Amino acid sequence: MAKRVTGPEIEKLIQLLAKVPGLGPRSARRAALHLIKKKDQLLGPLSHAMGEAYDKVKICSRCGNVDTVDPCIVCTDVQRDQSVIIVVEDVSDLWALERAGAMNAAYHVLGGTLSPLDGVGPDDLNIRGLIDRVGEGGIRELIIAVNATVEGQTTAHYITDQLQGLDVKITRLAHGVPVGGELDYLDEGTLAAALRARTVI
């Protein structure tokens, strides 16, 4: 059995870093060592920023985004088209769409997808909040931007069913060939989706 070569504080730092998605035990050790070597330039400021985030970050009561204000800056941005809502599974999806910069719309974060096998039902997600937002009026389009998984498609169909009878256009993201992708490397499902979502040029 290997002997411990660091104190409990450093071990705790490594264990906590290893819980971050994308970091395993080895990567966590490297990250911890890098932070410790750059104690004044990185570890101190990171510790301060994390403390501030812990104290100030909240979930937007309107859309489910994370921010330091409620409602969040996306919901209060008068430059956005608040009549169009892009529905996403998670905050990371919202951030990804914002990086793309293709639309200047509002968002609604569901907090996951329906998954009966995992015990995730409609009441476990932020679906009621979405239905309430649409019911308030002023929404002309919902863009369902969930992942192309069975759970994502089930969630999209459930939302569509719940909004039947309301005067709102419901669309979903096109699925298909990625920019720069080669047809020979794509699976049959992706190719079929691309053919169905074809557009006029």
Curated annotation (Swiss-Prot):
Domain Toprim: 83-178
Pfam families (alphabetical): RecR_C, RecR_HhH, Toprim_4
Family of the protein in this entry: Belongs to the RecR family.
Record keyword Cell wall biogenesis/degradation present: no
Zinc finger boundaries on the chain: C4-type: 60-75
Role, per record: May play a role in DNA repair. It seems to be involved in an RecBC-independent recombinational process of DNA repair. It may act with RecF and RecO.
GO molecular function, one term: zinc ion binding
Record-linked InterPro entries: DNA_Rcmb_RecR (IPR000093), Rcmb_RecR (IPR023627), Rcmb_RecR_Znf (IPR015967), TOPRIM_dom (IPR006171), TOPRIM_RecR (IPR034137)
GO BP terms, alphabetized: DNA recombination; DNA repair
Classification via PANTHER family: RECOMBINATION PROTEIN RECR
Organism expressing this protein natively: Rhizobium johnstonii (strain DSM 114642 / LMG 32736 / 3841)
CDD domains (UniProt xref): TOPRIM_recR
UniProt entry keywords in alphabetical sequence: DNA damage, DNA recombination, DNA repair, Metal-binding, Zinc, Zinc-finger
Keyword Isomerase: no
Name the UniProt record assigns to this protein: Recombination protein RecR
